[in-house]
Amino acid sequence: MEETKATEQTESIKEAKISESIPLDELKPGQLRIIKRNGKVVLFDVSKIEVAITKAFLAVYSSTAAASSSVHQKVDELSKKVETTFRNRMPSGGTIHIEEVQDQVELELMRSDERKVAREYILYREARAQVRKEELLDSQEEVKEEPLKGVARINKVATEACEGLDGTNPDQIVTEAEKNLYEGAPEEEIKQAMILASRALVEKEPNYTFATARILLDSLRYEALNFLDLDKDALQEDMKDLYPKALSSFITKGIELKLLNPKLAEMDLEKLGKEIMPERDNLFTYLGLQTLYDRYFIHSDEVRFELPQVFFMRVSMGLALNEENKEEKAIEFYKLLSSFDYMSSTPTLFNSGTLHSQLSSCYLTTVPDDLYGIYGAMRDNAMLSKWAGGLGNDWTPVRGMGAHIKGTNGRSQGVVPFLKVVNDTAVAVNQGGKRKGAVCAYLETWHLDIEEFLELRKNTGDDRRRTHDMNTANWIPDLFMERVMNKETWTLFSPNEAKDLHDLTGNEFKEQYEKYEEEAKKGNIKAYKEVDAEELWRKIISMLFETGHPWLTFKDACNLRSPQQHTGVIHSSNLCTEITLNTSQDEIAVCNLGSVNLKNHLDKDNNLDKEKLQKTISTAIRMLDNVIDINYYAVPQAENSNFKHRPIGLGIMGFQDILQIKKIPYSSDEAVELADDSMETVSYFAIEASSDLAKERGSYSSYEGSLWSQGIFPIDSISILKEHRTEGFLDQNEEKKMDWDTPVSYTHLTLPTISRV
């Protein structure tokens, strides 16, 4: 009996969709309400309990009980006890399920020694429960007897989805999907049921992730082809003929809707359409394709009309707009992207070929120490984030809390109040409407506000001095680490009184920093604070453990090994700390990124296929260089910097996949050797490809004076770092020269993500 009641109650709760609105007077505070079995919510009515108990008495004592005053009194007494129980339990009102009320009636009947009446009441409830159960089974049988609309196509989609995938069963997908369908179900619900049924099987068999992706692809085809006035019921086997038409129709529609660059229509769409490879749709995992659907595909009023291979061709066409042989290069780029051998950065995938082709990943800015500059930097953040750029802000120049303000003769509130505004700006201005805005604030370790800065991501404290949506990073000079190791004191300064520290590195920084310490002791510097270096380091590490912030970045290593140190100073890294570029009032540094998928570059013996890797990197470097010329620049300082220095960043992904394939533990010496070998190979081919491109396009404008022009490779610049560090700190010496030009100032990096399509 208890099991039956529990089942009924569970079913009722599942069906609890309040289909009828409740009158306002029934929503007053203190009201008791009842959830009926059909899900409807009504006011608690004690008279209904009186009727039910009276019927139970009549069943035992016959109709004479109806005229008995003692029975009426007993019914009234029992009903009030039931009501009082719930009033005491919920004095402020609340909602009770009908089963709970009936349980309480049973209990009160038993307590009052009316056992015969209680027994009759229980039997009545069981009889009603059995009737409801039979009615439910009958309704289910009726549904099963009627065939589902389009069942033949459902079976065909499932069969196509599982083709060639070991361990998958199309019948199982269809069976699970049919459990959630009904006669007359809309097309969208049928497709969604198929996706959910297949997705639920992924944990049992990983290959279902590919099957689910193919089912999702069928749903996408229906949506896109219908919008493009093509055969919306097409299956994957039909796409060889349909993809060229879809490309042409997509370009035409996109230009009409003012979403795509009209220059795309000037290319030979027929030639490009013939090169599309529909079979590469089957390379997607479910998560990869769903991510593209949610964020990347071009849409009109939330209707996606861009198919996966059209998407890759659109990106490739956008990157080839300035090429002499546009179609040939677009095809070359398409083959690389659609194979997943190489993947462009998210902004490039978002915006290539569109009217605002903002293709760069991250922007680095330095914030000046005045209100116009501070709020100007925030405006730049908003404009850059609008077109999907990530942001890295250097806040070290802004004076610390308590520092004197000459203009107002007041005291500064420091950087933290401004960072709160930056945090909220990043939330308010998302990245092209496709993902949240993202920013990282950098502060050098000697800044007077560093201790408060470390606590910005804490969940406790004054929320006006917290930035829950913004990343933070600590820009650490080597001298601080020396003080930590030697257990010495560390002095914090306000940058308005230690003006040049932020622009100095290595031995020059150390010399000037110690001079400022002497000036502070003499009383010539007002805003400063001495702290224990080790204690500050402990706080940094504690906050990193507690909040994941601040990230640790090292100023001297970044600057002393920079190929571009002749043109300025690196004041910070970017949003994801993977690239370090010069910034100033006239230059907002720009990251132009992409990554090679190492997993796709293994030979039959599972070793790196270096010949294929060389070809991939050669094409990738060209694509990245094209980004610089095609890119839409929301602010002029970014354009100035990007054209002057032309930095690109080629990273890798798939390293963990290789370790799995080769059965190498991540923490082993073998893994370290593989990492060293793979990155050395990528580095060499990236520099070689850059040099080859320079022969065609010439070197970048600030090339002369760079470490490249001096024949110093990035790996060789470690000797420069050695000169500025304590004796014996590093013991490495390499002899190697480079006599090539290069069209870009930076070529490769460590990417911040392992996400993959």
Region roles according to the model:
Residues 747-753:
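Conserved small/polar residues in nucleotide/adenosyl-binding loops
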Residues 227-322, 407-421, 433-437, 442-550, ...:
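Conserved, charged catalytic cores of large soluble enzymes
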Residues 63-74, 92-98, 116-121, 167-174, ...:
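Flexible, glycine/charged-enriched surface loops at secondary-structure junctions
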Residues 1-305:
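Often metal-dependent polyanion-binding catalytic scaffolds in large enzymes
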Residues 60-63, 115, 162-167, 200-206, ...:
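Secondary-structure transition/capping motifs at alpha-helix termini
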Residues 143, 180, 633-649, 676:
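N-terminal glycine-/lysine-enriched basic segments
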Residues 298, 311, 315-330, 334-358, ...:
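Function-dense linear segments that define catalytic or interfacial modules
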